[in-house]
Design a protein with these regions (language model features):
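Short, well-ordered amphipathic alpha-helical segments that serve as non-catalytic structural scaffolds
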Residues: 7-19, 68, 118
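Non-catalytic beta/alpha edge segments that cap or flank active sites
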Residues: 1, 17-18, 22-23, 34-35, ...
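General beta-strand structural signal in soluble alpha/beta enzymes
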Residues: 27-30, 80-86, 136-138, 156-158
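A residue-level detector for well-ordered beta-strand positions
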Residues: 138, 146-147
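Glycine-rich phosphate-binding loop plus the immediately following alpha-helix
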Residues: 63-71, 83, 98-134, 142, ...
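Short beta-strand-loop/turn "lid" adjacent to the catalytic site in phosphate-handling enzymes
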Residues: 16-61, 88-99
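Short glycine-rich, Thr/Ser-proximal phosphate-binding strand/loop in the N-terminal lobe
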Residues: 1-3, 160
Length: 200
């Protein structure tokens, strides 16, 4: 995915040009990548974050967001680059980390940016604060994430990137474990082919 950096950066610049938006900004924000798990919030892009993004634990186009924002911001005077609520936001309660096997601790990669934005919008429409609400929010797209939001924190969410939870146009969803094990050792698919079938 990193090899698409220039291509995607140029798409951003082309979009600005097509819409006659001058390249003059006080700050630039990009979609956060799959860095180490962090609480929700806004983060300034720094060298450590860029290293984590280049060597991210998973491959996804979102890994380019902070890098592109940083590159574009570096061409302007006093212009910082940020990310907000990346997909690795981890605010899970301890009980939500329990799985049926100690060999597979729960990780969560979900649509945090979208879900938290919707939660804040809903709270505003209700005349209250996100931090005072209990919500269940679903992101329905190429992948599906479902999260429990409690007083401004997502205390449980599925790993949408790896296909956990409901199936969707680009994810197989949670599959029967026994059948999946049989498929893994059947010789029908390589590891990479199987991963592509689960999270295309």
């Amino acid at each position: 995915m990193i090899d698409q950096f220039e291509f995607r950066k140029n798409l951003v610049l082309q979009e600005l040009e097509n819409n006659k938006i001058p390249f003059s900004f006080d700050a630039i924000i990009g979609r956060g990548g799959l860095v180490k798990p962090i609480p929700g919030g806004v983060y300034e892009v720094n060298e450590a974050m860029k290293r984590d993004t280049v060597h991210a634990m998973r491959t996804h186009a979102c890994n380019l967001g902070g890098l592109i924002a940083s590159k574009l911001a570096s061409t302007l005077p006093n212009c910082p680059a940020f990310i907000a609520d990346p997909g690795v936001v981890d605010e899970l309660e301890d009980i939500a980390r329990i799985t049926g096997s100690p060999l597979m601790p729960k990780i969560t990669i979900w649509h945090a940016l979208n879900q938290k934005a919707i939660a804040r919008r809903f709270a505003k429409e209700q005349g209250t604060q996100y931090e005072s609400l209990d919500l269940i929010i679903c992101h329905l797209g190429g992948g599906i994430s479902v999260a429990v939001h409690h007083h401004g924190r997502a205390i449980d969410a599925n790993n949408a990137l790896d296909g956990e939870g409901p199936f969707s146009p680009e994810r197989a969803g949670t599959l029967p474990a026994g059948q999946l094990i049989d498929l893994c050792f059947s010789g029908q698919l390589t590891k990479d082919e199987l991963k592509k079938r689960i999270s295309g």
